From Swiss-Prot:
Tissues expressing the protein: Expressed predominantly in the ventral medullary surface of the brain, moderate expression in the cerebral cortex and cerebellum. Low expression in lung and kidney. No expression in heart, stomach, intestine and skeletal muscle.
Highest taxon in the source lineage: Eukaryota
Record PTM text: O-glycosylated.
Full protein name: CD99 antigen-like protein 2
């Protein structure tokens, strides 16, 4: 039983070593005799004669070299050479070109003949040089300011402005008319209410007069009581009727 387990263990170790060798390559310190040495002591107890293989010399194992398979290499980016920049050469830009008439796009300018025109390089030189600026005579036709340049001088008006003014006036007129109508309506309502109140008060007064007239007539028909001393001396006089109360 022990021999079978030992044989099975040897087979497993051998297969594992084969897989490791395929995955990582051959190692200098790997040898199958290591597995045979572990089982030699067990085999001596079952077999009378054992044959041992001659030992082979091995190089000392370095465990650090087993896993040192990945090597990294870094490459530097080659430097690029650039042309030296000259700050003075910016597309040939120079402020002196503004004073030179020969490098203009429309060609050299013709000298002014005194018939219209605007400012020229000569005028700028006179201003910068300290000399008084004296505009040329008869130059009112070219660069002068006319009434046609003023957008507000014409008689044409924006139609949006006219529409806004008309709408504002219409709204104001409509508001005034509606306010006047509401005032007249309220005034008429108050006058009608006053007439109704006056008629109501007058009707109440008439009812009071009608109710009081029978009492006055009854008082006039009744005679005052006569005492014994004045029964034969003074005749009885009817009482004056009372005025109706309003």
């Amino acid at each position: 039983m022990v021999a079978r387990l030992t044989t099975l263990l040897v087979c497993l170790v051998f297969s594992l070593a084969t897989l490791v060798q395929r995955g990582y390559g051959d190692f200098d310190d790997f040898n199958l005799e290591d597995a045979l040495k572990e089982t030699s002591s067990v085999k001596q107890s079952h077999f009378s004669t054992t044959t041992r293989r001659t030992g082979t010399t091995r190089a000392p194992a370095n465990p650090a070299e087993r896993w040192d398979h990945m090597t990294t290499t870094t490459t530097k980016r080659p430097g690029t050479t650039r042309a030296p920049s000259n700050p003075l050469e910016l597309d040939g830009f120079d402020l002196e070109d503004a004073l030179d008439d020969r490098n203009d796009l429309d060609g050299p300018k013709k000298p002014s003949t005194g018939e219209g025109g605007g400012l020229s390089d000569k005028d700028l030189e006179d201003i910068l040089g300290g000399g008084g600026y004296k505009p040329d005579k008869n130059k009112g036709g070219g660069g002068g300011y006319g009434s046609q340049d003023d957008p507000g001088s014409g008689a044409v008006t924006d139609p949006g402005t006219i529409a806004g003014l008309v709408s504002a006036l219409a709204a104001a007129l409509l508001g005034a008319v509606s306010g006047y109508l509401s005032y007249q309506h309220r005034k008429f309502c108050f006058s009608v209410q006053r007439g109704l109140d006056a008629a109501y008060v007058k009707g109440e007064n008439l009812e009071a007069v009608v109710c009081e007239e029978p009492r006055v007539e009854a008082a006039m028909c009744e005679a005052p009581p006569v005492t014994d001393s004045t029964q034969h001396s003074q005749p009885t006089e009817p009482l004056a009727p009372e005025r109706p109360r309003i």
